[in-house]
A protein has these predicted regions:
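Anionic N-terminal interaction surfaces
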Residues: 1-42, 96, 105, 109, ...
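Phosphoinositide-binding peripheral membrane targeting modules
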Residues: 24-41, 45-97
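Short, exposed beta-strand-loop hairpins at the edges of beta-sheets
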Residues: 101-103
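C-terminal output/interaction extensions
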Residues: 112-115
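IQ-motif-like calmodulin-binding regions
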Residues: 119
């Protein structure tokens, strides 16, 4: 089933969880892992995926995407092959298809397990 993603992000490398992410979290929510994107960060929390997307020339305008795990209907993961550099996560929600490409060295199975744990326990 091939569909055009409504959103697409590329995670470049794992990074420390930014200290300012605490302001985005609700009571009882914890940041679990963070990854650099080309311009900002994606944070996997105990309740959702948060992606901060810096925009414009200066990067001062920031759009924040929040994808609650409870809204993920189906997902798939694809590991990098011999000639492929990137692995990939595909998530399907009621809003549409979201694609997350993973840079070399990012453990797609770890993220798959994290999403599985969060989605299945959020139901």
């Amino acid at each position: 089933m091939e569909t055009t993603p409504i959103l697409a992000w590329t995670l470049v490398a794992e990074c420390p969880i930014p200290s300012d992410v605490q302001a985005l979290l609700v009571q009882g929510e914890q940041a679990v892992a963070a990854y650099r994107t080309f311009r900002d960060t994606a944070i996997f929390t105990s309740m959702r995926l948060i992606v901060r997307d810096a925009q414009g020339m200066s990067g001062k305008k920031v759009e924040i995407y929040s994808l609650p795990y409870s809204r993920i209907d189906m997902w798939s993961s694809e590991n990098a092959g011999t000639l492929d550099w990137n692995s990939e996560l595909e998530m399907r929600t009621r809003a549409g298809h979201i694609s997350v490409k993973l840079g070399k060295g990012i453990d797609v199975r770890r993220l798959n397990n994290l999403i599985a744990h969060m989605v299945l326990h959020a139901r």
